[in-house]
């Protein structure tokens, strides 16, 4: 977005909040497709002539306004030429440009708030693994957790109402309604999972923006309750919330909810309440009793239905005891268990033993869902037996090995925080044997005969465990260093879940 300022003249729109004219600016659509990073490309690209593109944009918007949504059937919507149902290039350009333009007011507010507060960004907080050190520190001291499936809005108008408090351009909001209705089935008043799936695939950037705006409103209540109940205002909380909320609206939350919640219920003023979220799933953990957790459950359901006008029911929130149930979160099974330890104390001439059993958060690789993902990708069958994977005949043996090695490394990298490595070793075994069977099938041989025929160094890198690299690089590495590597490691460069790991 920093590169866009020279083209979009954001200082002018900062004062007037007029976004509608940007729809008719040629460079908005060029920037949406990556042509704006070099200003000379705008002049050299024949397909982006100002006059012709402006006429295309006007024609598409006029066509959209003239549609009669009351007579369009479900079959007709599949053949709708707008928004790329027939993969029309100009419709795609218009929708992508719209997605960039609608982000401008939020980007300006984020920049101004960061400059005023002098907040230093910590990009390591973007890593998925940065959540687990927080869980390891807090969850062993908590008793119950509420697994929450975040509800989706029942009508498209809710998304427009969410944005109208921040986007002041009425013409632009009016056009936004037509965009949203065009993406959905016009004969349906309720948003379905199928329409959401089509929406997210046809324009992922626009979908993510609307989803983050909606989640931002949903999570605002948690920040408001924290500010009302907390006596110590930690400066780090603003930085952490910047990653979750994206737009830094702490002052705005206090104004919005102060009138709606003049008196905060006592059970909401819980200093031991902790909240984490990833995508559409969140966890609310507390040291409260089951009675208070059920009050939280009832409160959240009523809040969603009455204040945010979204459909929800009690079954979307499951309350579990942390010591007896595992959390299925971020493709890990996490549970709190006691870790017994014996400590020997020496006082003068007397010595005695102390039995200590502190709670510890266990993070385990979900072996059954992961084998299901491998079976779906044709690496093994349903019970985990490795099979040969169909591959292109023109690929060399080294290319096939490198592809399997890349998958194995990615999985090992993501599950490096597992407290038990046994399940990960089984997954590696499936991938390695599947690679051998794939190569044997290519050479029209059996796996055993193929291994006898090739050189032992052929699979050396593929069969070398990650822990063995420490010994190869540092031959005299200490025992403590090797033990540290065999433990849990959380990486700060993982920003998304591997496709095979994402079984949720």
From Swiss-Prot:
Chief site of localization: plastid
GO molecular function: RNA binding
Pfam hit, one: MatK_N
Keywords, sorted A to Z: Chloroplast, mRNA processing, Plastid, RNA-binding, tRNA processing
Annotated GO CC locations: chloroplast
BP GO terms, sorted: mRNA processing; RNA splicing; tRNA processing
Keyword Lipid biosynthesis: no
Location within or outside the cell: Plastid, Chloroplast
Alphabetical list of InterPro entries matching this protein: Domain_X, Maturase_MatK, Maturase_MatK_N
Family the entry assigns: Belongs to the intron maturase 2 family. MatK subfamily.
The protein's role, per its UniProt record: Usually encoded in the trnK tRNA gene intron. Probably assists in splicing its own and other chloroplast group II introns.
Protein name listed in UniProt: Maturase K
Biological source species: Quercus lyrata (Overcup oak)
Source lineage: Eukaryota, Viridiplantae, Streptophyta, Embryophyta, Tracheophyta
Gene encoding the protein: matK
């Amino acid at each position: 977005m920093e590169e866009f300022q020279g083209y979009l003249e954001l200082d002018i729109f900062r004062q007037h909040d007029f976004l509608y004219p940007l729809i008719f600016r040629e460079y908005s659509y060029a920037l949406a497709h990556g042509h704006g990073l070099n200003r000379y490309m705008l002049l050299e690209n024949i397909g982006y002539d100002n006059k012709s593109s402006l006429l295309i944009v006007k024609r598409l918007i006029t066509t959209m306004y003239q549609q009669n949504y009351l007579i369009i059937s479900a079959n007709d919507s599949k053949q709708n030429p707008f928004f790329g149902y027939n993969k029309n290039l100009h419709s795609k350009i218009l929708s992508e440009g719209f997605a960039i333009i609608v982000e401008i007011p939020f980007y300006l507010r984020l920049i101004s708030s960061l400059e005023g507060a002098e907040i230093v960004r910590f990009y390591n907080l973007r890593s998925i693994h940065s959540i687990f050190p927080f869980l390891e520190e807090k969850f062993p001291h908590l008793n119950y957790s509420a697994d929450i499936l975040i509800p989706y809005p029942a009508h498209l108008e809710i998304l427009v109402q969410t944005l109208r408090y921040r986007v002041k351009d009425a013409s632009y909001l009016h056009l936004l309604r037509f965009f949203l209705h065009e993406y959905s089935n016009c004969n349906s008043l309720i948003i379905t999972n199928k329409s959401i799936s089509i929406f997210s695939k046809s324009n992922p950037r626009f979908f993510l923006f609307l989803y983050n705006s909606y989640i931002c409103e949903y999570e605002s209540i948690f920040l408001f309750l924290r500010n009302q109940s907390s006596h110590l205002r930690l400066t780090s909380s603003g930085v952490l919330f910047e990653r979750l909320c994206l737009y830094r609206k702490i002052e705005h939350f206090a104004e919005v909810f102060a009138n709606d919640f003049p008196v905060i219920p006592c059970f909401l003023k819980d200093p031991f309440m902790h909240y984490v979220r990833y995508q559409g799933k969140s966890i609310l953990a507390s040291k409260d009793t089951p009675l208070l957790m059920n009050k939280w459950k009832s409160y959240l359901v009523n809040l969603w239905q009455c204040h945010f006008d979204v459909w929800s029911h009690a079954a979307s929130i499951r309350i579990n005891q942390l010591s007896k149930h595992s959390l299925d979160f971020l493709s890990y099974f996490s549970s709190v268990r006691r870790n017994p330890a014996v400590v020997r104390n020496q006082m003068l001439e007397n010595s005695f033993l102390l039995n200590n059993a502190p709670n510890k958060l266990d993070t385990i690789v979900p072996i059954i869902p992961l084998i299901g993902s491998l079976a779906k990708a044709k690496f093994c069958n349903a019970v985990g037996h490795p099979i040969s994977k169909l591959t292109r005949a023109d690929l060399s043996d080294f290319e096939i090995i490198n592809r399997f090695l890349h998958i194995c490394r990615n999985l090992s990298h993501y599950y490096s925080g597992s407290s038990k490595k046994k399940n990960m070793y089984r997954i590696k075994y499936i991938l390695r044997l599947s690679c051998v069977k794939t190569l044997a099938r290519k050479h029209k041989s059996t796996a055993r005969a193929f291994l006898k025929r090739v050189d032992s160094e052929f699979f050396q890198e593929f069969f070398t465990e990650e822990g063995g690299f420490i010994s190869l690089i540092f031959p005299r590495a200490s025992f403590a260093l090797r033990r540290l590597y065999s433990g849990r490691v959380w990486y700060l460069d993982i920003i998304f879940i591997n496709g095979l790991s994402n079984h949720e």
